[in-house]
Amino acid sequence: MAGNFWQSSHYLQWILDKERQKDLKFLSEEEYWKLQIFFTNVIQALGEHLKLRQQVIATATVYFKRFYARYSLKSIDPVLMAPTCVFLASKVEEFGVVSNTSLIAATTSVLKTRFSYASPKEFPYRMNHILECEFYLLELMDCCLIVYHPYRPLLQYVQDMGQEDVLLPLAWRIVNDTYRTDLCLLYPPFMIALACLHVACVVQQKDARQWFAELSVDMEKILEIIRVILKLYEQWKNFDERKEMATILSKMPKPKPPPNSEGEQGPNGSQNSSYSQS
């Protein structure tokens, strides 16, 4: 892994300004946010089914968000992109390559057992589609595959505070939850870690004002992140995924269905030129 975040492709190319998506022509901002939560949950469930480490799952989630920050949902079916991101992340994070059979079986099982209310049909893709989708994902990211996460700085901060046993479990869960937002595309990981730690301190009623005051960090940025986290929890508690997702998915702009045979088509059945959308 690259040793310096500030010189890494993560910082130089993938800390993005927030932009409206083309998909907001079809979906409200709230519906788009719910779609992002849904597919983050799919990636999480798939990673857990495959017994992947949380960092692998987090990296897969970042890949997914990077792709759809630059391309419409219409370009490649997110149901295909989700396992593709897991497949690539498992290799990049040196977990080991997930076998073709295991990946397809796990995706089919997770969609059928955990998300049948939103995806009643069989998983329509095979490994050749995932491998082709991986090519487009790599092309978009220009092979910039190293992802920095808030977990390591969070651990260092909590140890520095001397509150590891009290604060780390809650702050870690909050970091996991931030992947259901776009924070990983908008802010450096150390800032996300500090924001999650701040929320954990408030919840656990730990006075850390002096510790935060001594940091050389833009606290306005930290407060921006905290507001996003609090908004996530406020909206999340009112989100009935089982009731709402089928309708939202039906409004999502759709790519063409997968081809019946291999050829010069992309993984969603469209010609390669359809991947030039921005």
UniProtKB/Swiss-Prot annotation:
This is Cyclin-C. Its main location: nucleus. It is found in: Nucleus. SUPFAM superfamilies: Cyclin-like (SSF47954). It comes from Rattus norvegicus. The modification Phosphoserine is found at S270. Belongs to the cyclin family. Cyclin C subfamily. Residues 41-139 form the Cyclin N-terminal domain. Residues 247-278 are annotated as: Disordered. One of its GO terms (cellular component) is cyclin-dependent protein kinase holoenzyme complex. Residues 267-278 have a biased composition (Polar residues). Keywords: Activator, Cyclin, Nucleus, Phosphoprotein, Repressor, Transcription, Transcription regulation. Component of the Mediator complex, a coactivator involved in regulated gene transcription of nearly all RNA polymerase II-dependent genes. Mediator functions as a bridge to convey information from gene-specific regulatory proteins to the basal RNA polymerase II transcription machinery. Mediator is recruited to promoters by direct interactions with regulatory proteins and serves as a scaffold for the assembly of a functional preinitiation complex with RNA polymerase II and the general transcription factors. One of its GO terms (molecular function) is identical protein binding. One of its GO terms (biological process) is protein ubiquitination. Component of the Mediator complex, which is composed of MED1, MED4, MED6, MED7, MED8, MED9, MED10, MED11, MED12, MED13, MED13L, MED14, MED15, MED16, MED17, MED18, MED19, MED20, MED21, MED22, MED23, MED24, MED25, MED26, MED27, MED29, MED30, MED31, CCNC, CDK8 and CDC2L6/CDK11. The MED12, MED13, CCNC and CDK8 subunits form a distinct module termed the CDK8 module. Mediator containing the CDK8 module is less active than Mediator lacking this module in supporting transcriptional activation. InterPro entries: Cyclin-like_dom (IPR013763), Cyclin-like_sf (IPR036915), Cyclin/Ssn8 (IPR043198), Cyclin_C_2 (IPR031658), Cyclin_N (IPR006671).
